[in-house]
Amino acid sequence: MAKQAIKRAKILAVKNNNKIGVLLINLGTPDEPSVPAVRRYLRQFLSDPKVIDVPSLVRWIIVHLCILPFRPKRSAKLYQKIWMPEGSPLLVYSEMLRERVGETLGDDFCVALGMRYGKPSIETALKKLQEAQCRQLIVLPLFPQYSTSTTASALEEVRAKNSFKEMTVIDRFFEEPHYIDSMTTLIHENLNEFQPDYFLFSYHGLPERHLVKSGCQLAICNRKNNCSPISSSNENCYRAQCFETSRLIAKKLNLTDQQYGVAFQSRLGRAKWIEPYTDKYLIELSKKGIKKLMVVCPSFPVDCLETLEEIGIRAQSQWQRLDGETLKLIPSLNAHPQWVNAIAKMAKKSLQLF
């Protein structure tokens, strides 16, 4: 059925000389690792009411009086540590992914990249697809696990700028077999040179209140335990989706429950975020005698500040101070051939929704 839908869509596209547009969305990055550029980026990012979900006046005070006077200088130094000759890793790898997905999908498709914050903007990406005479639009935010602060915010921006009459959205893929297989292959490739004592799956954290607002009916569950398997009562719970992704990858790797764990990084501010925290989890692992640790970041399909600096540098340094022998960070999927094919397959699969 799906193959017939894809075939019909391709015939229609060719007949009308119209392409199918694919919009890949990532979070965004500063234009350069300078204080002014980081300040511009953070101002746009943190002013989003879906990111800091408090009354507008309170948000303005937090952003303009508590964060922007101080954080840009610190963050710029962190970006400088990971900046590539070609530019921001997030942008470089995202563009590489866009290009290779386009090559894989072929001439009947046009693939564009839009950043929720910074450049290239979602509006710019949509204009490119319109100029390419695309008449159908597939939107794929590169956030495997759904959350209001990433996926919902990106989709809200798309709908505000979109002029396509036919649009389908892939709003999550945390349990998509092609994604899980891509992650598993990536890990297997790194196991050839390193055999860890333990696997840690580290995800971007969120304030706990975001889970409540997302409609998770298990938001008052015991956060010290693993989330329950995905069901109608927690299908929009970001934390539950992270645990489900980890379970699926661990199953593919034949890991026992004692061989891996899940933690959350990148917390900001004083509000309570979902636990356990990655930095504190490292302390617990060291107390258990773990020496060789492999860290995987499934919520980041593209390498960025949170993977390369927060884990690759800061967590690495922390692990050494804790007398750990080795902390190996698995690279993000970036433009891995299997991941490129996975995105192409997800895009084609979504055509049956038109």
UniProtKB/Swiss-Prot annotation:
Keywords: Cytoplasm, Heme biosynthesis, Iron, Lyase, Metal-binding, Porphyrin biosynthesis. Pathway: Porphyrin-containing compound metabolism; protoheme biosynthesis; protoheme from protoporphyrin-IX: step 1/1. It is found in: Cytoplasm. GO terms for molecular function: ferrochelatase activity; metal ion binding. Gene3D superfamilies: 3.40.50.1400. Its main location: cytoplasm. It comes from the Bacteria. Fe cation binds at residues 204, 306. Its EC number is 4.98.1.1. It catalyses: heme b + 2 H(+) = protoporphyrin IX + Fe(2+). One of its GO terms (cellular component) is cytoplasm. InterPro entries: Ferrochelatase, Ferrochelatase_AS, Ferrochelatase_C, Ferrochelatase_N. It holds the Pfam family Ferrochelatase. One of its GO terms (biological process) is heme biosynthetic process. HAMAP family: Ferrochelatase. Belongs to the ferrochelatase family. NCBIfam families: hemH (TIGR00109). Catalyzes the ferrous insertion into protoporphyrin IX. This is Ferrochelatase. It comes from Coxiella burnetii (strain RSA 493 / Nine Mile phase I).
